[in-house]
Amino acid sequence: MPFTLGQRWISDTESELGLGTVVALDARMVTLLFPAIGENRLYSRNDSPITRVMFNPGDTITSHEGWQLHVDKVNEENGLLSYTGTRLDTQEANVTLREVLLDSKLVFSKPQDRLFAGQIDRMDRFALRYRARKFQSEQYRMPWSGLRGQRTSLIPHQLNIAHDVGRRHAPRVLLADEVGLGKTIEAGMILHQQLLSGAAERVLIVVPETLQHQWLVEMLRRFNLRFSLFDDERYAEAQHDAYNPFETEQLVICSLDFVRRSKQRLEHLCDAEWDLMVVDEAHHLVWSEEAPSREYQAIEQLAERVPGILLLTATPEQLGMESHFARLRLLDPNRFHDFAQFVEEQQNYRPVADAVALLLAGNTLSDSELNTLGDLIGEQDIEPLLQAANSDREDAQAARQELVSMLMDRHGTSRVLFRNTRNGVKGFPKRELHTIRLPLPTQYQTAIKVSGIMGARKTAEERARDMLYPEQIYQEFEGDTGTWWNFDPRVEWLMGYLTSHRSQKVLVICAKAATALQLEQVLREREGIRAAVFHEGMSIIERDRAAAWFAEEDTGAQVLLCSEIGSEGRNFQFASNLVMFDLPFNPDLLEQRIGRLDRIGQAHDIQIHVPYLEKTAQSVLVRWYHEGLDAFEHTCPTGRTVYDSVHDELINYLAAPESTDGFDDLIKSCRQQHDALKAQLEQGRDRLLEIHSNGGEKAQALAESIEEQDDDTSLIAFSMNLFDIVGINQDDRGENLIVLTPSDHMLVPDFPGLPEDGCTITFERDVALSREDAQFITWEHPLIRNGLDLILSGDTGSSTISLLKNKALPVGTLLLELIYVVEAQAPKQLQLNRFLPATPVRLLLDKNGNNLAGQVEFESFNRQLSAVNRHTGSKLVNAVQQDVHAILQQGEAQIAKAALGLIDAARNEADEKLTAELSRLEALKAVNPNIRDDELAAIESNRQQVMDALAQAGWRLDALRLIVVTHQ
């Protein structure tokens, strides 16, 4: 094309330069000025990587003064173009804009503009863009979206609770599963769903101080949720950045004590507009009608301001009706306002629970039982269901299930309370205790005597704590020269046990980090035993490495030495041998230690070894735990209650372990109290609540569906394709592990979610569960989600040219592959993606406007095509520009019908689902006061907004590929 001064051109290789203007010419060279960056570039007149910028009628262009023109007509005179049309800001018609006055910062964003401007992408990027659109749209439509991405086993009762609660508007529930059933995981799954769907954006987690790191680790490791820990130091630091320090982060963890201590801090927390709050160990919130505790009042203040609340507690309601009521009162103060009325209501649920038990037993129902059911579900005609349930017909079981669902919907606290018990959930191992009684060394005896004389002023509790750890008493007197491990018989026993069980993995837990470190050194130096250490002084990454080394089967560590705090939040189901080098001070911590191995998914019975020194507090405690509470071999929900009731007596025995007069009687009375409480718990088991929390067959089916999805290989193929194109190196390490590292030629210099030093990934859930250092890649992982956003939010792959070698078609035949996106714009919290995610529609048009997409599948067609370099591609485009415009117009006419079909289907689905949910809850509200007015109002408002947003849905061209037939 001949050059003329004043013409506008664009660089094919440096599109960021904007529009260039021809400012000088000679026989062989042309000089372009790029005003946007104030630089000149020199190009050869022949075959340079630059493209003439020419707009067409229908385009909107911008002048260098900033106003826009809708082009009606294009004129050419002496090689220069001028555009005539309507000025958009003043609506003035027949305005002419010469090309030299076009805005130099022009960015081509429409696929067709990029194609005509010579901004042609690689063919593989176009294919990746289409796949990304397709997969993203499919993933949003999955019914279990938000439940697959976590690094957890697929346990039905957990999935059931998370699926039910995670989809609610601002859920306010009490999760009260027994110890070891995974309340933290359930809460994490609910958070993950709410954050992923946009229903929540700001989350606050309030936990006891000792559990802060456990939550931090669990949220990051299992759910890829990066929380910030707020303590006094962090709070003070953030005050420099914002008036309200809590507004500097979206996801925050802090301790209950931190919340309670300062009035100003509590006010800042209340003002920070959280969407969801999680409170762990909610049984620590003490309440009575006359005197609620400071902690309770602080959480109550927050609960009034935060729409969604998850309270977690392992304490069953039978051990304290009043405190159970207090927790429910936090969730819904209007519903739970009178304790006496609540107690009466609870007693009225007994006939409902009995009715459920009857239906589940499968026996024939008597007339009086049928009448009772009729009375309980009185507001609608259930006669046909009752007849079916009482017959031998095939649908009898289904009818009984439906009646159970109706009863559960209508009665009890089933919408606000979930509680699974070990009795109701199968799959737990047995626990076997082995106690090893060892003599107290003379060195310890002397140290204890001296300590008793010197510590006469200490309280009984301080002396009791000292007596639990004689090695520390000895070390205090001896200083750095003390080597307690040389004579402590527990060390000898441990070495003997480990050397005689070399093929077995053993978890050793002790109270203090120093003990763990000293034991590691002794085991390594004396016996060459491979031991990993795990304590609170290590970073999360160091702990991951230690855990991964312990998890390796052949070359890994035989033993993992953990301190009390260091082991929080970590589970090692692959090991079944637990050694307690010392004992913790209270039953909760004991259960927490055993809980590291005693989880669902543990394949073997757990062997618990307790080597203890006689005449120390350990010998007292081991008997009290085992004989008084049966706390080693069974979970002990009564432990805390019994411990609190005998606290002072027990402390005195621990402080002076040689004086055991009356200790047998104490053990006996504790055992009686424990048995009575346990019987009370068993008798008061709320079968109704357990059935509802467990989820039954529905939960099982959900777990199986997700497991099936785990086996889908399309994610692996897509991920590898994505990593290749983004420029991420992949190194296959075997055992289903791949190491990803950034390369020097990345699509973006800093890929979000990929650390500078890389990371190890796996696509296998089982591998991810046993290897804590490997990230579990699913469609919900930040690496994949960020990759999809990176490709789809920019123009990567939005315009390309390919050659089709096909002798059945004439040379030069044109095809245009158009990828349209049908979408609706709306705030994220409306979760429009459930009904109409950005959905790609593919058209493959020939010159006559025939759509061949139905006959020609994308992947097989893509394999037949070959790439064209950018320079040749630009020439091809210029030669067929008019034809492409004509085909594009035919595409616009055809997409409307397909898009409107998708939009109508989405509107019908949304209307049906949201109206059905609203009607169901409105009908139930008449008989179940646990349905909140604000929840109904939110569903109605949400339905209206969703319908309005879908009415505004539209479509746009997202990507196109020009295909030219060749015979070579």
Swiss-Prot record:
Superkingdom field: Bacteria
GO BP, one annotated term: regulation of DNA-templated transcription
Alphabetically ordered keywords of this record: Activator, ATP-binding, DNA-binding, Helicase, Hydrolase, Nucleotide-binding, Transcription, Transcription regulation
Residue window of motif DEAH box: 280-283
UniProt name for this protein: RNA polymerase-associated protein RapA
Binding site for ATP: D177, E178, V179, G180, L181, G182, K183, T184
One Pfam family matching this protein: RapA_C
Chain's gene name: rapA
Quaternary structure annotation from Swiss-Prot or TrEMBL: Interacts with the RNAP. Has a higher affinity for the core RNAP than for the holoenzyme. Its ATPase activity is stimulated by binding to RNAP.
Family, as annotated: Belongs to the SNF2/RAD54 helicase family. RapA subfamily.
Enzyme class: hydrolase
CDD domains noted in UniProt: DEXDc_RapA, SF2_C_SNF
Residue span(s) of domain Helicase C-terminal: 490-644
Lineage: Bacteria, Pseudomonadati, Pseudomonadota, Gammaproteobacteria, Enterobacterales
InterPro entries membership: Helicase_ATP-bd, Helicase_C-like, Helicase_RapA, P-loop_NTPase, RapA_C, SNF2-like_sf, SNF2/RAD54-like_C, SNF2_N
Residue ranges constituting the Helicase ATP-binding domain according to the UniProt record: 164-334
Molecular function in Gene Ontology: ATP binding; DNA binding; helicase activity; hydrolase activity, acting on acid anhydrides
Keyword DNA-binding included in the entry's annotation: yes
Organism expressing this protein natively: Klebsiella pneumoniae (strain 342)
